[in-house]
Structure formats: C-alpha cells, structure tokens
C-alpha cells in the first residue's frame, strides 16, 4: 500500500454524521500509515458566518421547519441542475483552491456533497482523483457529478439509484458507512452492566434524547416506563443539560430503573446491553446499530434523508417507525414484551451491516487513484 499519497478529506457539520465519518476515515488513514492527511470543514473555513447561520437553520428544521426542509430536500432532488444551482457549485471555491495549493493532495474524499470539488476539475483542468463517501441509506442527486470518480455507498439500493441516473457500475462500490472501530470489536458485556449499575436479567431500553431536542415529553415517557419493574431505561441527553436536569428528580426516585446520562464517549458500550433503542434515523447511528444488532424505534423522522433512512430500515424489518408521541409508549412496551419480534429485528438489522467499511473504502480509493495516475501519465507520454 502506497501510504505516501497526500489525502484531503472534506466535510461539513450539517449534522454530526458527515464530520464523524471524516474523523473515522482520518483515523483509519493514520492507522494504515498515511503521512499526509488533512481534514477540512470547507464551508466553515470558507465563510464562517454563512456556515453558522445555515447550520442553525438546518438544526431548527428538525423541530420547527420540517415542511420547509421537506420542500427543499425533495424539490432540489427533482429540479437539480447546474444552471439553477450555480451559487452552490461555487461555495468554498476560493478556500478549496488554497487547500489544494497548500497540501497538493493526490486524493480528495468528500463526506458531504460538495460539488465545488468536481467543478474545480472542470474549471481548472487539474485532475485530482475525487471520491464521495455517502452517509445515508438513500440517494440525493446533489451528491452526483460526472467528475466524481467513484461513490462508496451503504447498500445495493443506493447503488441501484445511482445506476438509474446513469452512473457507470464500475464507479459505485457497496461498502457500508464508516463507523468508529469500537463498534466492531468484541467485548464482554458483564463489566458494562456493572459500570452502569444495571441488571442483566431485565430488559434495557436506550433513549437517545439529546439530538436536536427532537423527542418531546421525555420526562412523561420515562415516568410511564419506570412503572414496569422488568424494564431499565437509560436516557442519553448528550449536551442537552436542561433535559438532564429535568430528569434528575425522577432518576433519584427510580435509581434502579432509570439512568440519566450526559455525553457518553463510549456509546458502543450501551448499545451492547440494549434490547432496543429510541433514536433519530441518522445514517451513522443506524449503521452503528447494525454493527451490534440493536432494534430501533425511530420517532417522527424529518422529511428528507431521515425519512428515507427510516423507510429503508422499516421495509427490511429492522425498525419500527412511530409518528405520534402517544404511540411511543405502546410501541416500546409491546416490542420489549415480544421476544420473537425482538429476535427477528435483531437479526434483520444485523444482516444490514457491512464490516470494516473505512478500511475497505481507503484500500479501494488508493487502488483507484493509482490507476488514474497511471492513465494520466500514459496519456501524457502518448
């Protein structure tokens, strides 16, 4: 493996998933021995004010602007073309030129749909092998450009969608979505139960409640769940300190049945002891669930990639989608009481996992880039 290649990984923090995938690929590059790897949050570096405003609007779309985001997501996918989206095609152009001049990359990897990168090739004539690592279980056309050399996708479904719009089969590889390696490592669960003071003889429900405040009335839900002596509830609030504080009294009263946590670095540990999880259908979280085999209850997916992700998992018997708050409690209690359905869902979601995605992707990218470089040299000499 030629680890002397210079790698530039571009991302954007519209949701944590794109950044997390970039970080995972960076760390895999380091493990493989690459000496020159750079990660750039291109839009943030290019125009911090615009980036922060649009990130704020993006996050708000999860709670108060769902219909606007639905119109944007599906509308752009239908009318997407270069003329109408000329401004987007140029976003980050100056900063990209600076990064290319500074780092002289042999490879560019996108974990966010940045069309400025393949457009850079068209405008300058400079051919830098460019690869898109897609972070959802669906396709949006904004990822697609004739100057992207290869796409790395989660499933055969996404590959089929790319082929339908004219992408050559050799330019698409099904690899899964890169996730942190600890999710694919074996680990005894006994110490984890002990660490969180949970019983292995009772069901564990994990509620990922910190993400953008999407799940409402968490306290009311927990008040009902703790009435069941056979269920232990773990609520991860992330950086949502207000939510954590609002649950503190209930936790104090039900310490053996309710655990309220803030940010959890080793969230994979909780996944290993969880019988089912309530979460939002982000591509990374769902991929992490496939690695360990955690059935998921997906609450009120936002129209767009979340809704498409949720549909994909529900259609394959790996998730239950709940669109009304009053249905959550019934869905959770019914699932936890039904061993056959739990077992089937665990198998179904585990079957969706593709292991070692980051390693597979980087090895293929290196092979593809070397082939492209050889072709370019042969073309010059001919």
From Swiss-Prot:
Keywords: Carbohydrate metabolism, Cell membrane, Glycosyltransferase, Lipid biosynthesis, Lipid metabolism, Membrane, Transferase. GO terms for biological process: enterobacterial common antigen biosynthetic process; glycolipid biosynthetic process; lipoteichoic acid biosynthetic process. One of its GO terms (molecular function) is 1,2-diacylglycerol 3-glucosyltransferase activity. It is found in: Cell membrane. The keyword Membrane applies. InterPro entries: Diacylglyc_glucosyltr_N (IPR009695), Glyco_trans_1 (IPR001296), Glycosyltransf_28_UgtP (IPR050519), Pro_diacylglycrl_glcsylTrfase (IPR023589). Its EC number is 2.4.1.315. Disruption phenotype: Cells displayed reduced and abnormal cell size/shape, no effect on flotillin cluster numbers or size. It comes from the Bacteria. Its main location: membrane. The keyword Membrane applies. SUPFAM superfamilies: UDP-Glycosyltransferase/glycogen phosphorylase (SSF53756). Pathway: Glycolipid metabolism; diglucosyl-diacylglycerol biosynthesis. It catalyses: a 1,2-diacyl-3-O-(beta-D-glucopyranosyl)-sn-glycerol + UDP-alpha-D-glucose = a 1,2-diacyl-3-O-(beta-D-Glc-(1->6)-beta-D-Glc)-sn-glycerol + UDP + H(+); a 1,2-diacyl-3-O-(beta-D-Glc-(1->6)-beta-D-Glc)-sn-glycerol + UDP-alpha-D-glucose = a 1,2-diacyl-3-O-(beta-D-Glc-(1->6)-beta-D-Glc-(1->6)-beta-D-Glc)-sn-glycerol + UDP + H(+); a 1,2-diacyl-sn-glycerol + UDP-alpha-D-glucose = a 1,2-diacyl-3-O-(beta-D-glucopyranosyl)-sn-glycerol + UDP + H(+). GO terms for cellular component: plasma membrane. Processive glucosyltransferase involved in the biosynthesis of both the bilayer- and non-bilayer-forming membrane glucolipids. Is able to successively transfer up to three glucosyl residues to diacylglycerol (DAG), thereby catalyzing the formation of beta-monoglucosyl-DAG (3-O-(beta-D-glucopyranosyl)-1,2-diacyl-sn-glycerol), beta-diglucosyl-DAG (3-O-(beta-D-glucopyranosyl-beta-(1->6)-D-glucopyranosyl)-1,2-diacyl-sn-glycerol) and beta-triglucosyl-DAG (3-O-(beta-D-glucopyranosyl-beta-(1->6)-D-glucopyranosyl-beta-(1->6)-D-glucopyranosyl)-1,2-diacyl-sn-glycerol). Belongs to the glycosyltransferase 28 family. UgtP subfamily. This is Processive diacylglycerol beta-glucosyltransferase. The lineage of its organism: Bacteria, Bacillati, Bacillota, Bacilli, Bacillales. The gene is ugtP.
């Amino acid at each position: 493996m030629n680890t002397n290649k210079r790698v530039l990984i571009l991302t954007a923090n519209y949701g944590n998933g794109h950044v997390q995938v970039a970080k995972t690929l960076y760390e895999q590059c380091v493990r493989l021995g690459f000496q020159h790897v750079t990660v750039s949050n291109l839009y943030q570096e290019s125009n911090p004010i615009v980036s922060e405003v649009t990130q704020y609007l993006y996050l708000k779309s999860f709670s108060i602007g769902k219909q606007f985001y639905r119109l944007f997501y599906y509308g752009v996918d239908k009318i997407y073309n270069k003329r109408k989206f000329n401004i987007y095609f140029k976003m980050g152009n100056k900063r990209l030129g600076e990064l290319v001049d500074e780092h002289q990359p042999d490879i560019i990897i996108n974990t966010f749909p940045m069309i400025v990168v393949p457009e850079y090739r068209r405008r300058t004539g400079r051919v830098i092998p460019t690869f898109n690592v897609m972070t959802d279980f669906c396709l949006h056309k904004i990822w697609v450009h004739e100057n992207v050399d290869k796409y790395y996708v989660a499933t055969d479904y996404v590959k089929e969608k790319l082929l339908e719009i004219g992408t050559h089969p050799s330019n698409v590889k099904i690899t899964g979505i890169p996730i942190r390696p600890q999710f694919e490592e074996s680990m005894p669960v006994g110490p984890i139960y002990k660490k969180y003071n949970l019983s292995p003889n009772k069901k564990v429900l994990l509620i990922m409640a910190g993400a953008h405040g999407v799940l409402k009335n968490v306290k009311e839900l927990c008040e009902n769940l703790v009435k069941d002596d056979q269920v232990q509830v773990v609520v991860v609030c992330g950086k949502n300190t207000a939510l954590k504080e609002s649950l503190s009294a209930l936790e104090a009263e039900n310490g053996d049945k309710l655990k309220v946590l803030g940010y959890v670095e080793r969230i994979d540990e909780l996944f290993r002891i969880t019988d089912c999880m309530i979460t939002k259908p982000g591509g990374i979280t769902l991929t992490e669930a496939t690695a360990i085999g955690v059935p998921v209850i997906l609450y009120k997916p936002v129209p767009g990639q979340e809704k498409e992700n949720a549909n994909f998992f529900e259609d394959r018997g790996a998730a239950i989608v709940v669109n009304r708050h009053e249905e959550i409690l019934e869905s959770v209690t019914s699932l936890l009481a039904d061993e056959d359905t739990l077992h089937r869902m665990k198998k179904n979601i585990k079957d969706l996992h593709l292991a070692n995605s980051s390693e597979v992707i980087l090895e293929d990218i290196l092979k593809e880039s070397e082939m492209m470089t050889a072709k370019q040299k042969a073309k010059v000499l001919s």
